[in-house]
Design a protein with these regions (language model features):
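Acidic metal-coordinating catalytic centers involved in nucleic-acid phosphodiester chemistry
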Residues: 1-11, 63-358
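Basic, amphipathic N-terminal segments that precede the first structured/catalytic domain
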Residues: 2-7, 11-29, 375, 402-403
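Hydrophobic, glycine-enriched assembly/anchoring segments
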Residues: 355-403
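Extended hydrophobic/Leu-rich segments
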Residues: 51, 59, 326, 388-391, ...
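Catalytic centers of nucleases
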Residues: 13-14, 20-83
Length: 403
């Protein structure tokens, strides 16, 4: 039973943390395009801390199951108050320039502290009644779980309590983690359209999570600034323009082990031209990156119908020009050394000079270089003048044996 409870608590913590990140990302997207003078941090001054030219907002987030209510004795309420009271007592927060926000997916019972501290626009806000209810709840409760929160509350003077309550806003029945994903998708649709919204958001969230981890592992304040977010958002959006395709960092950094691919045809092709170890490593790297990136584009429907086929046709036809020139220059009496030297020039052209982009603005080198290796693996092109005959002589007997 204990293990199940621990697993439930761990799962709830993970959900709560992802919820926190999604709310922070939503806040960034909301501010995007409305100026750069802001920054946001996770688990710095609070769950989420926002600093703008209008002041500071400290937010506590509580993700709870459907049907849960935020009562006056709720642990969620008092844990939040404990954090804020502690910050006030230790002079880590200036209430004159700070808003305190408690956002919860729980319901706010009528007349409760949370209900009475909703934003002014709700029409029910009453700070005096809310403070009275807090004091009454504190005096009536014997909760051990809330003991430290009560002690922190007791340390506040009457004036400090009133000042704190005046800065608190409670938002109940907030969108849960799934609803937040839907809201995020709505936010990015204007940037990339409905067709690419999910792919765009997946990449933006990935960057945001990695960036947040970096911030959490840094001792000093390393908040995400408006300028930084604007650059990332804009750069990523541009990758979804009609003339571009997204290049994913996790793929662009792949470094596969060449020894895992020694039997592949494109590697055998390099063996025919006596390619060195460094060239083999780079070739395998480019092949894997291009293959993986192209597969992801296809899986996410980011490609136009027949786009890969048309791209490969262009590469093959360009190669045909270079290869035909090599054949003419070598002639029938060429030695093996001359053939290898000429093949190296063809390979050099493919990897150093041919930069045919799949789309005008998608100029990542591994896409073209790796696509050449994909074609070489299918024997649709090669480097050595006799590549087809030599490889077929090796591959066909092997295929017959395996059959």
């Amino acid at each position: 039973m204990g293990e199940k409870e621990d697993l439930f608590e761990a799962s709830a913590s993970v959900v709560g943390y992802i919820y926190q990140l999604r709310k922070a990302l939503y806040a960034c997207i909301e501010r995007h395009g409305r100026g750069l003078d802001w920054c946001i941090a996770i688990e710095a001054g609070d769950d989420i801390e926002e600093i703008t030219d209008r002041g500071r907002v400290l937010s506590q987030l509580k993700h709870r199951a459907t049907g849960v209510s935020l009562t006056d004795s709720s642990t969620d309420l008092w844990k939040t108050l404990r954090i804020w009271a502690h910050a006030i007592t230790h002079e880590r927060v200036d209430l004159d320039g700070t808003d305190l926000l408690l956002l919860t997916t729980a319901d706010l019972p009528a007349g409760s502290v949370g209900f009475l501290l909703q934003p002014v626009a709700s029409g029910v806000r009453n700070e005096d009644r809310a403070l009275e209810a807090l004091v009454a709840a504190r005096e009536a409760s014997v909760s051990r779980e809330n003991r430290k929160a009560y002690e922190a509350f007791d340390k506040l003077s009457e004036a400090e309590r009133r000042s704190m309550v005046a800065r608190i806003q409670v938002i109940g029945h907030a969108p849960d983690i799934d609803a937040m994903e839907a809201l995020l998708l709505e936010k990015v649709v204007p940037a990339v359209g409905h067709q690419y919204a999910e792919s765009f958001l997946e990449r933006l969230e990935g960057w945001f999570y990695r960036r947040t981890i970096r911030q959490l592992r840094t001792d000093e304040m390393d908040a995400i600034t408006g300028e930084e977010f604007d650059q990332v958002f804009t750069d990523l959006r541009d990758q979804f323009r009609p003339g571009n395709l997204p290049i994913d960092d996790d793929i662009a950094l792949l470094e596969p082990d060449p020894s895992d691919h020694v039997d592949m045809v494109f590697v055998r092709q390099l063996g025919l031209i006596n390619a060195g170890g460094a060239q083999l490593r780079i070739a395998v790297r480019d092949y894997i990156r291009a293959f993986t990136q192209r597969s992801r584009w296809s899986d996410e429907n980011l490609l136009l119908p027949g786009e890969i086929s048309r791209y490969e046709r262009r590469l093959v036809e360009e190669w045909q020009d270079i290869f035909a020139e090599m054949e003419d220059n070598l002639g029938a009496e060429a030695t093996e050394a001359e053939k290898v030297a000429a093949a190296k020039e063809v390979y050099r052209w493919a990897t150093r000079e041919a930069r045919r982009c799949i789309r005008p603005d998608c100029d990542e080198p591994f896409v073209a270089k790796g696509s050449f290796h994909i074609l070489a693996d299918d024997l649709r092109l090669g480097w050595h003048i006799d590549f087809l005959a030599r490889l077929m002589a090796v591959l066909e007997p092997a295929e017959a044996t395996s059959a």
